Design a protein with these regions (language model features):
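Well-ordered alpha-helical segments within folded domains of soluble proteins
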Residues: 355-365, 430-442, 506-516, 555-566, ...
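Hydrophobic, well-ordered secondary-structure elements that form the walls
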Residues: 318, 461, 511, 564, ...
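Alpha-helix capping and helix-loop boundary segments enriched in small/acidic/polar residues
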Residues: 305, 347-351, 364, 421-432, ...
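Acidic/histidine-rich catalytic neighborhood
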Residues: 463, 467-519
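Aromatic-residue-lined binding/catalytic grooves and analogous aromatic/hydrophobic interfacial grooves
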Residues: 1-425, 443-445, 478-479, 516, ...
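Alpha-helical positions within canonical tetratricopeptide repeat
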Residues: 76, 310, 372, 452-456, ...
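Non-catalytic carbohydrate-binding regions of carbohydrate-active enzymes
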Residues: 440-448, 452-453, 462-474, 526-549, ...
Length: 694
């Protein structure tokens, strides 16, 4: 069972189901051999259409907002921002629908279901019947194969939570529908939260089967067969982020069926494609029983911490999710990767660019999957194109910028409560995500060593540099960002609680790296001094000595300088970062735990990194409500915020890679790693009791 997720019961909910994907198509398979469900996603299916939701006159209020901040009238500054300087919510990543396979009887005896991370194949077995499912990147199809030692019968249906119809046509079961024009996040409850309209994206899914089947009405019937292959195709009318979604979704969908090979050929091509990526990196950690079901191992890990091979499985799972969720030509992964079953998913399953989107791509280069980084580059190009409108509207500035939330249409404005009917100041008022993503692209370039990519990068950096040249303001004789925040955190100053301030440490650290990267690309950029340790021995979070309101806050934004920054910091700053981390604690959301694994690993402390990995392997009940601490893992090893957010899976994978590359190994680790990547080459070695074996 090495590098496999294994269970002895069908899934009852999303957090127990198994994810499969090819970057564009994502499914969750439940493994119920009486009433099987495959939930379906297509990565371009979003609500909305291209529209400018910047507040064109927001810059008229900028001077008054800055004056209030510098005068420490935080209430006034917040009111101005909420009323006059926000945009609208970004749009939502949507579920396409479900494929349901209702077998004529239940298959339960000797039940098992597995997901092979090396091959990207899910297999469910019981009572002589085997159901195999994978999502082929070469064929761009979902493939299901059912075989049994005696004849079986089943009825297949398609359905969707979106406006849709199901018909049968020429042996194909068709699901056609349209996404809404507007889909508000679930925490917004005022007025109409889902607006259907007629301008939203259209979608189409088609199901076919080989051999003799009956496809009429709203179902496809399989009768007395010992073997059948199902092919499922999906497509949308999405064109690009600038254009109305008017492509022919049905023609696109049907085209994927053209020339589809037989099942053995489809399977062989899929495994060759998938395993070629997965085989680049191996990790063995001694200790643990791979023959046990994964959910059992997860529970046991909390008792004795001895199942180190479960950590290796978690590491490879992050790589697996990258291969399944992000390929060249697809869209960047969202808060849930490409897997979402809800119309109004938590935080709209969109792009949160004050940590989460970036974290999705932290491990990609180091774990040998550099080509899977491409969608983040494409996403950055969207932001650079749209961000000039935001720079002009909010600062009357040149260049481009982007804020904390985006979508497939490349939203760059400060997303939040429209019309000032709520307080969005602790997350929306942050114009630094474009620079952060560019810094991440620069780090990627160190691996790629591609002059053409560097030239593309230089153009995007030049635009963002122009924004900072014309948007920063002087305070106490220094250029500062204002207004700004330390993402989602608050402070107290003179009895006033606020998020809004100027030049928080994260801004300074991002700009320090950004300007150095500009100069490395041949651009003339000023020097921004790095943050310095505070008198209390920690890295300060803000420009002034404010009082913390939440000492163990989930964001560790002020430690950007340690990780994900690729630059080596001074001994003094590293020592201060350790004190900051100790004060922050060892809890938090799932993605927060992953970030702290990366930080402790970068600081060379494998024991504290391991402590956080163990916390991330804390079993979480799928019924757990949304909360901002108490993260862990669901039975299917997907990251629990809770709720599910995929970024934590990538954060912990990046952290484990950092531990192995930097030699920050805990004493209990013995094993072997091969194929990890640095800008200077590959890393492969054996280790025993936390020490490298030459």
């Amino acid at each position: 069972m090495k590098n496999q997720l294994y269970y002895t019961k069908p899934a009852k909910c999303f957090e127990q189901a198994l994810p499969l994907g090819n970057g564009r198509l994502g499914i969750m398979t439940y493994g119920n051999l009486r009433h099987e469900r495959l939930s379906l996603n297509e990565d371009s299916l979003w609500s909305g259409y291209p529209k400018d939701q910047n507040k064109a006159d927001a810059h008229k209020y900028l001077a008054a907002c800055r004056e209030a901040i510098f005068a420490k009238d935080y209430a006034k500054a917040k009111d101005i921002l909420n009323r006059d300087m926000h945009g609208h919510w970004s749009e939502a990543y949507l579920p396409l629908g479900n494929l349901r396979i209702d077998y004529d009887r239940a298959y339960k005896k000797n039940y098992s279901r597995t997901l092979d991370l090396r091959t990207g194949v899910a297999v469910t077995r019981a009572d002589g019947l085997t159901q195999t499912v994978f999502v082929s990147h070469p064929a761009q199809l979902v493939v299901g194969h059912i075989e049994s030692d005696r004849p079986f019968s089943a009825t297949c249906r398609l359905d969707s939570l979106l406006q849709s119809t199901v018909t049968a046509q020429d042996g194909t079961l068709l699901l056609t529908g349209q996404a809404p024009e507007v889909c508000m996040p679930p925490y917004y409850t005022q007025g109409e939260t889902v607006v259907q309209g007629s301008r939203g994206m259209r979608f189409c899914a088609g199901l076919r089967a080989d051999g003799q089947v009956t496809c009429t009405g709203d179902s496809l019937r399989i009768e007395n067969r010992k073997e059948v292959t199902l092919l499922l195709s999906m497509a949308t009318s999405y064109v690009d982020f600038r254009s109305m979604p008017t492509a022919d979704e049905k023609a696109r969908m049907l085209a994927y069926f053209d020339g589809a090979a037989d099942y053995p050929t489809l399977l062989a091509a899929h495994i060759a494609d998938f395993s070629a990526l997965m085989d680049r990196v191996t990790l063995e950690l001694e200790g643990g029983d791979d023959s046990l079901p994964t959910d059992v191992r997860l529970k046991r890990m909390q008792k004795d911490k001895s199942d180190q091979s479960l950590i290796a499985l978690l590491f490879q799972y992050g790589r697996y999710l990258t291969v399944s969720g992000s390929r060249p030509g697809t869209n960047a992964m969202t808060l849930q990767g490409i897997w979402n079953e809800q119309v109004r998913a938590p935080w709209s399953s969109s792009y949160t660019t004050n940590i989460n989107t970036e974290m999705n791509y932290w491990p990609t280069d180091a774990v040998g999957l550099g080509e899977c980084f491409t969608p983040l580059v494409d996403f950055a190009e969207k932001l650079a194109a749209n961000g000039s409108s935001t720079a002009k509207a909010y600062f009357d500035a040149d260049g481009w910028c982007a804020c904390h939330n985006s979508d497939i249409w490349g939203a760059t404005y400060p997303a939040g409560f429209p019309d000032g009917d709520g307080d969005s100041s602790c997350y929306a008022v942050w114009f630094m995500s474009g620079a952060w993503i560019l810094n991440q692209l620069y780090t990627h370039s160190l691996y790629q060593k591609d002059p053409a990519f560097d030239e593309k990068l230089k153009g995007m950096f030049a635009g963002a540099l122009a924004f900072f040249h014309s948007s920063m303001t002087a305070h106490n004789g220094q250029p500062v960002t204002c207004p700004s925040i330390s993402p989602e955190n608050t402070f107290t100053d003179n009895g006033q609680r606020s998020a809004v301030t100027y030049m928080p440490s994260m801004d300074r650290e991002i700009l320090h790296d950004f300007m150095e990267n500009c100069r490395a690309l041949g651009l003339d950029a000023p020097v921004i001094d790095q943050v310095a340790p505070a008198p209390d021995g920690r890295v300060p979070e803000w420009a002034e000595n404010y009082q913390e309101t939440e000492v163990e806050h989930r964001h560790v934004s002020h430690l950007y300088c340690i990780y994900p920054s690729h630059r080596v910091q001074s001994d003094a700053l590293q020592a201060a970062a350790k004190q900051s981390l100790l004060k922050r604690g060892f809890g938090g959301t799932g993605w927060s735990l992953g970030w702290k694994v990366c930080l402790w690993a970068r600081l060379g402390d494998g024991e504290n990194a391991l402590r956080l990995i163990e916390n991330q392997l804390r079993p979480i009940n799928p019924k757990a409500l949304i909360r901002v601490r108490g993260g862990g893992s669901y039975p299917n090893l997907l990251d629990a915020h809770p709720p599910f957010q995929i970024d934590g899976n990538f954060g912990v994978t990046a952290g484990i890679a950092e531990m192995l590359i930097g030699g920050a190994l805990p004493k209990c680790w013995s094993g072997k790693v091969t194929g990890l990547v640095t800008p200077d080459g590959t890393v492969s070695y054996a280790f025993k009791n936390g020490k490298r074996v030459e």
